[in-house]
UniProtKB/Swiss-Prot annotation:
Part of the 50S ribosomal subunit. It comes from Yersinia pestis. The keyword Ribonucleoprotein applies. Gene3D superfamilies: Ribosomal protein L30, ferredoxin-like fold domain (3.30.1390.20). GO terms for molecular function: structural constituent of ribosome. The keyword Ribonucleoprotein applies. This is Large ribosomal subunit protein uL30. GO terms for biological process: translation. NCBIfam families: rpmD_bact. Pfam families: Ribosomal_L30 (PF00327).
Amino acid sequence: MAKTIKVTQTKSSIGRLPKHKATLIGLGLRRIGHTVEREDTPAVRGMVNLVSYMVKVEE
């Protein structure tokens, strides 16, 4: 089984760069407090790093 991480949106995407909004959608996050579980891959880690100021990550 692949290792997973939990990603939770902690801040609003209103007024953010369009690229950052698209990254949140790509991660599957829709609203503040929404949590998704994703595979721990370099691609997902890169997306999380881009919007790290808006999300919380749990290993």
